[in-house]
């Protein structure tokens, strides 16, 4: 089905998600890259060496959740917008996601936005915590949102109402 729709199945999502124990320790990357393509900016961006593509640039990136510091440098560098950071250490009821967001207008901190699943369907409300857009991100802002834990494996993006 993925080949026709581009929408990852639950099994695919779970295969790339860090363990819940790691998520609860602090920020960690989720690399939702499911196809072999010639790409490695995530590997070169990672200062901890936690994302590896290897000698063949077509390899699917592998993330070492123990080495990942959750710095987020990989998020804005991924041309496929396939990486997000998840952090479950701040609350028992919510998780924070840092996602690439290349739409205008950018949301503002404190704003409530619509949380979307991988098919682009509304699933929840999300509270914008911050928006980061330094020149080093090369016009790929990263939006941090807080989402109810019930949507940990379903949340993928946001929609503003503007």
Language-model features: locations:
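Ferredoxin-like iron-sulfur electron-transfer modules
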Residues: 16-38, 51-70, 87-103
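Short, well-ordered loop/turn sites that connect or cap secondary structure elements
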Residues: 106-108
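Short beta-strand-centered aromatic/proline hotspots
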Residues: 121-135
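Intrinsically disordered, low-complexity, charged/polar segments
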Residues: 157-162
